[in-house]
UniProtKB/Swiss-Prot annotation:
UniProt xrefs under InterPro entries: Thioredoxin-like_sf, TXNDC16
Composition bias, Gly residues: 622-636
Gene3D superfamilies the record matches: Glutaredoxin
Natural source organism: Caenorhabditis elegans
UniProt KW Signal keyword: yes
Taxon lineage: Eukaryota, Metazoa, Ecdysozoa, Nematoda, Chromadorea
Region (Disordered): 40-60, 620-646
Name under which the protein is recorded: Uncharacterized protein R05D3.9
Bias type Pro residues, positions: 40-51
Amino acid sequence: MWPSNRGPTLFQYSIRCLGFVAFIGVVRCHCPHMMGVKPPGPPSGPSPPGKFPDGDEGWDYDETAAPGIVPEPHFIQSTYIYRSPNVQEKTFSSRVVNVLKDIRTRLAKSARLTLENENIECSSPTDHYRCQEYPASGTWNYLIVEDQQKGAVTYTFDRKFNEKNDGTIEMALLDAFSRHSPSSLIAFASSEAEKEVGYIRALTVQEMDSLSGKRSHQKISMEKFGPNELILLEPALLEVRTGANLKLNSDSLRRIDSTKEFDKLLEEFRNVFILFWNSNRMVSLHTFNLWSRVADKIKISEDTLLAHVPCHDNADFCQGLNSEDYHTVVSYRNGQNTGKTENIGDVEFYENWVELSLSGAIQRLPNESKLSEFKKGIVGGKKRSSVTIGVFPSDQDTSFQHFQIAAEKLSGKYYVAYFINENSKPAITTYRHAEKQKRTDYSGKFDPATLMEFITKSSIPSIIGISNGFTTDLLFHQKRPILIQIGGAGEFEPFSKLSARQDARKTYIFTKIDGESEMIKKTKKALGVGENESIIVFLNKDRVHRIPISKPKCPDHLQKILQMIITSEADQVLSTKEPHPLRYLQVEKVNEVFGFEETLVLPDHTLFLDSDPFSRHPPITEGGGGGCPFMQGGGAPTESSQHSEL
């Protein structure tokens, strides 16, 4: 074990950055240019050692850590909520806030951990929704830590056990955060804290229930994809294409070849969108083709630039990127990273994403005319499938501030706006003009988490059309069975009415297939459906059940049939050694976008699993990031008088 006061040697640090011993010296293994931070000038000579920008010691650098430890990128969300009715307790809680701020900065630099923390003070009367869930009297300090793998855990840490010095507070907090991190964070403690012992304890379920009689545990679940992300292209299908006849040039795209040029463009243009790509990778090649077509078509203002970095010609400039980064588009505003998308869609998808990025997370509607227009789904002169509008008496209203936080967390995915009406109570509504039920009103608490749940769930169509493809993780790698209406003249009422019920959509995913293309015929054949047959297919992983459309008489009857099917023998069991029947629909979309190619559809047993075991990255909550800083784009938290965010 290395002494705690000894940092990594130059040789050890090079091994940790590069993973091999062929290079000795300090190597820039992060990519500062990706977030608008100016790196040093271009090196001279062949492959010289790089230099970190001032104040930056590298993502995996920590002078007190054992050499060779390179933490995995991770995201954690936390809330420090406290009630300090006297001076002694106020002093302690103030120290905790300062220590949290210091920890956040240090872990981001040294442990590649993105920590998003919110401080909530409940000592005086407040509207903050979280205070209502805890005792209205007494003294308490709670830390709620949440990550996607373990969910939320509430910890208690008392002043009397941790007030010795800031080091004891730090060790208590690091103990809690370590339980939600891939590896222990104790190694990243400050010199003041490393010899201290803090005390923090997770509350039991019984203790949680006894905190407040009004407290209720309701798990928040959100849709992963927005309405513009329902038909994304599958990278695995792009990998097996030849890429022949792809257009690989565009007069509308600016090529960037150096850090100096990159920095100049960030200063010259207010908005910059950049694709980093590599011609040696088939997925990246197809993404560049799409991006060049977007640049030729989209209408943008003079202060906005679409550009690309050909990494196959600029290896040093793109150092630190991985395979997924080579089909990622990054957005900048006023020189700062504001977001990114690694999703691959058609030209319309990228157009919508750019427009959403330019318009911001939330728009203010200045008058009744604009409000009426937005309600009809008209945003930026185009008809959108869904929009969400909040009406508030003031932009200082707590409900509005929480709505704003929710919108910023979902930035780049949804069309969200607000209207100020001094005589109105807070109200939020989602409008979907193509649905039978055109509006959905919000009736929950005005807290960011449940507002996000409402926006994501109310914006998705009740029945998702998959005839022309679908996003892989929309149907695969999740627990809900898939219901597919195939054939039938017009709308099948029991199916459509059941899909309109929120509780039913929590249990099933409702989809529909129309048409008779060759790929649709292959899908129907693989599911055991005749060419002219009208049927509902109940697909539960590899189990196929077929329900004739004529059988259900009403929504309730259909629901009973579905409940009985769960325990009955399947009509057909799909083989994991054969291509998944729905994969053919995704091939159809790829051919539509890039032109027809005879595509070999391969079996993939992971499509039958709840999650992809070969996913490169662990799931990260929206807005999270790690590793290369340009991956950390997203909505910024908003401060209010009731709570501050570090």
